[in-house]
Structure formats: C-alpha cells, structure tokens
Amino acid sequence: MNLSWLPSMLQTTDPLFPIGSYAHSYGMEELCADGEISNREDLQTFLHTVVALNLQEFELPYLRFAYEAAKRQDYDLICDLDEEIGASKPSKELRQASLSQGQQRLRLISKLRPSPRFEELAKLKREKRIVPQHLIIFATENVDLNTPLPAALAAWAYQAMAAPCAASLKLIRIGQEGAQTALTNALERLEPIIEHSLGIDREFAGAFLPYLDIASQRHEKAYSRLFIS
C-alpha cells in the first residue's frame, strides 16, 4: 500500500499549517451573537444542517471537479471553476476568506514542494484568470501529492466540520469536550455526505444558504468581532 501522500496531506490540513483559517468563523460568530447558536446542541444542529448541506451539494462536488481538472491539467476548466466558486459566495467576507486562504496556501506549498502545477496556478493568478479560490488550490495540491480523491474529499469535509467547533470555543460556553462531542457526531455522518456528493453533476451543483449568507453580511458591519469572517 502506497501512503506516501498521507504525511504531506496531514501536514497541510493541520491547524498549524499557516493559512489563516483560525481567524475565520465563516458567519458563525454572528449566529452566536444573535443567539442562534448558544450550546452544544445548537452547534450540532448547525453542523448537521448548514455545514453538511453546503458540503454535500456544493463544496465536495466542486472539489471533485477541480481535482479531475487538475489531474487532466485542464487549466481553462480550472479558471471556469474558480470563477463559479467565487460567484456562489454572495457575502464579501466569505469571498475574501476563500481568496486569502487560497493565496496563502498556494504561496506556501509552492515554497515547500515546488511543482509545475503550482507554477501554472501562480501564472494564472498573475494573469488574473483565477483569484485563486482556496478549494481550487487544495484540489490541485492533492492531485500533486497523488492523494486519492476519496481521501481529499474526506480531508476537506473534516476541515469544514472542525472549523466551527474550533470557533465555538471562543464564542459560546461549550468547552473542549463539548466541541469534540459535536465534532464526533458530525464526523459519524460524513460518509453518506461524501457518497451523495459523488453523484452530483456540475450543472446541478450548488447550495442555497441565505441563513449563512445573511449572517456573514451582518457580521461585516458588526460593532465588535473576534473573527475576520
């Protein structure tokens, strides 16, 4: 069994990997301020509904499209996907969160593990053909590592579920054990989410989440805040 991809994938999905993800709550801070999320049960509901739906219907399908495009080195398609991902984020904060993490990930992995794929993405960025979106860089990186697609999907989904749990420690009275309990319950439901996402075609990919979009837009104007988004 060839697991040469695994150590590097673990490194770049670890919270220690400095792309700034710790500074974002992705709209959750405003939901906590409004009282929508105030305890572990509320957090679990948020993970099982909003986060799960966004993963299943939008992020995981687009991660698969980007992974397959990077594998074929179809950079025209990568440009199209990058634009579509950005257009799907009506909130300025969410767009900027994806942009900043995508740029930082590309900059860092290009230094740590130089690759023609990363050079091409940097060229597309200079030409302003891509932003690049974080998801695009993550997909291309895992193609370059020879990470199997299911593992890449699971790693992205884990990050999406873990981020609100990490933010919750600063936003509500939950504690480390409560946050880990919520995360464990969410992770137990990941497999069917990933399986379902594999059957979604590009023309049907997308999630309508005004609840989160409105919270993120309100967060932009908040009087005080802990997180960038």
Predicted regions, residues:
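C-terminal auxiliary extensions adjacent to catalytic cores
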Residues: 143, 155-229
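A short glycine/serine-rich beta->alpha loop
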Residues: 9-18, 47-53, 87-94, 122-128, ...
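Internal, conserved structured core segments that host functional sites
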Residues: 60, 65, 72-143
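Structural signal for hydrophobic packing residues in well-ordered secondary-structure cores
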Residues: 35, 47, 51-55, 67-74, ...
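Glycine/small-residue-rich interface belts in oligomeric ring/scaffold proteins
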Residues: 5, 9-73
